[in-house]
Design a protein with these regions (language model features):
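Amphipathic alpha-helical segments within well-ordered protein domains
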Residues: 29, 77, 121, 194-195, ...
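Extreme N-terminal leader/anchor segments
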Residues: 1-40, 48, 203-217, 231-240
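Terminal, low-structured helical/coil segments at or just beyond the last alpha-helical repeat
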Residues: 150-160, 183-187, 207-240
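Short coil/linker segments at helix-helix boundaries
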Residues: 11-26, 48-85, 92-129, 139-178, ...
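Glycine/small-residue-rich hydrophobic helix-like segments
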Residues: 170-212
């Protein structure tokens, strides 16, 4: 049974590399049907389901997207339970919580933020070269700074989340630049960094990142989508 689970995980990884997310998650879930606490199958299923939900517009309600994100969180929590010392499980949980939080009202988003940050930090403590966890921390800082001053005041004073005092644009840039440094071939890092630079009116730096997005080869399932987002951002920046 363990070998059957391992075979399905290997097939899921191959499907991921082929950018076939639906087939990948089928194999990861087949592995979990054999061994529900298989650490790698759980965290990989969580990340794959999250990616499958990403194309749905954030501005519209989507039960399908919400279901994908809920399944992702469930698998990520199980991965952490199966192997608390594994960086990828903590990263998958931070990513799953982060995706779900983006769909929620501000107050609910803030309630999730502390755990998202702590899970990403835990992943980095275990693996200091985890580019995905640095990406989440960069995004975390940026999303907190994008909130209104009133929302941040509410978080600090009524939710008891003093951790929000540590959020800054400088941290957002530092962590996202670190993600780019660790994996310069990952398109998503460059797109997110361009977005942060644009927020800080560093338009030349943003443009440089967007040109990299355009020039880099498609490597992952969502890369074509990210290239489209980058082209859209480039058009908006050209009007400034």
């Amino acid at each position: 049974m363990a070998q059957q689970a391992a075979d399905h995980v290997a097939l899921g990884i191959a499907a991921t590399d082929a950018r076939d997310l639906r087939t990948a998650v089928q194999h990861f879930e087949a592995a979990l049907a054999q061994d529900s606490m298989n650490y790698e199958a759980n965290w990989r299923a969580a990340l794959t389901l999250g990616l499958m939900g990403d194309p749905y517009p954030m501005s519209a309600k989507s039960p399908e997207r919400d279901s994908l994100y809920a399944r992702a969180e469930r698998y990520a929590r199980r991965a952490v339970a199966a192997n608390p010392a594994g960086a990828d499980g903590h990263f998958a949980l931070a990513a799953s919580l982060g995706r779900a939080a983006l769909m929620k009202p501000t107050q609910e988003k803030l309630r999730s933020a502390k755990l998202i940050r702590s899970e990403a930090l835990r992943a980095i403590a275990i693996n200091p070269r985890h580019d995905g966890a640095y990406h989440i921390l960069g995004r975390w800082n940026a999303e907190i700074m994008r909130l209104s001053a009133l929302s941040r005041f509410f978080a600090k004073n009524f939710l008891g989340a003093k951790v929000f005092n540590q959020a800054s644009w400088n941290n957002a840039i530092f962590y996202m630049e670190k993600a780019v440094q660790l994996d310069p071939g990952r398109i998503y890092h460059h797109l997110a960094l361009a977005d942060i630079y644009a927020d800080r009116k560093r338009l030349r730096d943003a443009g440089a990142q967007l040109r990299l997005v355009d020039s880099l080869p498609v490597r992952e399932a969502m890369d074509t989508n990210y290239k489209q987002q980058a082209a859209s951002l480039q058009k908006r920046l050209a009007k400034r």
